[in-house]
Amino acid sequence: MFTFYWAKTIDTINFAKKFLADGGQIFVGGIAATLVPAEMQAEIGNNVKIHIGLLDKPTDLNKSDSVIIDELPPDYSILEEIDYKYPARNAYFGYTTRGCIRRCSFCAVSTLEPIYKDYVNIQAQLQITENFFGKKQNLLLMDNNVLASEKFPQIVEDIKNCGFGKDSIYILSDEYDLAIKNLRAGFNDRAYIKKIIRLYEELEKKLPEVEAGKFYLAREKNFLLHFITATKEKILEFDSMAHPLFQKYFKQGKRTHYVDFNQGLDARLVTEENMAKLAELNIRPLRIAFDHYEQKGIYEKAI
């Protein structure tokens, strides 16, 4: 949560309150809510419950719930709802550890994730993501200090088991089939109607001129030229025409997998042994954190 989104976030929360049913409850959590809970509570009122910290216990929001929200993968379908192309849209997001062993004065991690957890099994998260949203090219890991983990060798093995070992490649997922599958399942209809309209437009550019004309007219007849007029029912009916064309003209190519420890590695913990383990992965880029100038020598040695 960056400060320049503060007003917009508060407005969104207060807008959501208008739709709260009698006896219902709104929870607000995350970075800003954890760092400045009093300031946020003053803006949104006492009828909204602020959750401080992670949702890493099954009873955090509901005493009878068995789900650990922190271990669930993100809902990648929200990226299909927006026109902006998120730069990291073709990446899995996750953690293999939580927290940090350091307590740097400038850093909020010790407040956000105060207890260092040296292992989070990422394999199940990536499998769920692949089933719902297809394979991603990159693995963007948000660990704050992965090298501090005594289970670092196991973490590397987990990542390799997910297909991100050295020189690993993968076959692109069929975006149209995934979108149709999720639309049939009723999973975020808005997102997948919008995505399928975009895929129609991409397909049309690949078709021979005469076939492209027929496809356009068929879309027009079924009100499938624009997201605002398209309906789920019409898209599912139109699948009998669209599916064979996607199969014929959309080839599932191969790509190289890459891993990015996005928050950087702790230069003080770089050793020959853990660098040898990292070399078993397709790392790009390799980030080493440089947080204190007085540690310049340590940083240079790590490089």
Locate predicted features:
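Glycine-rich beta-alpha loop elements in corrinoid/cobalamin-binding modules
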Residues: 1-89
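Short, solvent-exposed loop/turn segments at secondary-structure junctions
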Residues: 5-9, 32-35, 55-59, 99-101, ...
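Soluble or luminal CAZymes and related metallo-dependent hydrolases
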Residues: 8-11, 88, 117-124, 151-154, ...
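A structural signal for short, well-ordered beta-strand segments and their strand-loop junctions
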Residues: 27-29, 49-53, 93-95, 138-142, ...
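Alpha-helix termination/capping residues and helix-transition junctions
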Residues: 43-45, 101, 132-133, 280
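Canonical Radical SAM [4Fe-4S] cluster-binding loop centered on the CxxxCxxC motif
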Residues: 87-124, 128, 133-135, 147
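Conserved SAM/AdoMet-binding glycine-rich loop
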Residues: 127-303
